[in-house]
Design a protein with these regions (language model features):
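Long, low-hydrophobicity, acidic/polar, solvent-exposed interaction domains
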Residues: 1-159
Length: 159
């Protein structure tokens, strides 16, 4: 995805308070009838990022002014093409629990991937370590997108 028109930028900033890591959300520019581009500090862990994304998705869905054609995108710096690139995630449903499915690929913070796949027709779920940085998450998302996998669930599990 290269060019997005009619969008609102949403920023999630990295902040600290003593030894605590915090996320600061700048949602003042979020217009529910537009496409939303999420610019997220790569140092933030998923355990802080995902609850904020869930809240913002719910706000957009509940708006009387939402557009049925508007999308949500993560932005990232594409170092190969030297530009800002986007990953769509409008249909993605984040779950803050471990999956009940028998078909899951789990990506850990230390770079390991574990899979438990059954020979069935159920969609394969993706799971991510809640302590993984957003940068690591985006790197996995880019790799998964390039594989053009079929039958991947629209739910992602962060645990």
């Amino acid at each position: 995805m290269k060019d997005i028109q009619d969008y609102s930028s949403i920023y999630l900033f990295f902040r600290t308070n003593g030894k605590d890591t915090l996320v600061e959300v700048n949602r003042k520019n979020s217009i529910s009838s537009t496409n939303w581009i999420f610019h997220i500090d790569k140092r933030l862990p998923l355990r802080l990022v995902v609850p904020e994304i869930i809240k913002l998705q719910a706000k957009k869905e509940g708006s009387a002014h939402k557009s049925e054609t508007s999308e949500n995108y993560f932005s990232y710096s594409d170092s190969v093409h030297k530009n800002l690139a986007f990953i769509p995630f409008t249909k993605l449903q984040f779950k803050l629990t471990s999956p009940k499915s028998d078909s899951i690929v789990y990506f850990s913070k230390n770079g390991d991937a574990f899979h438990k796949l059954k020979n069935n027709t159920a969609a394969t779920g993706l799971g991510f370590d809640k302590n993984m940085s957003f940068e690591e998450y985006i790197q996995y998302k880019i790799a998964i997108q390039q594989l053009n996998l079929q039958n991947v669930s629209e739910a992602e599990f962060i645990y």
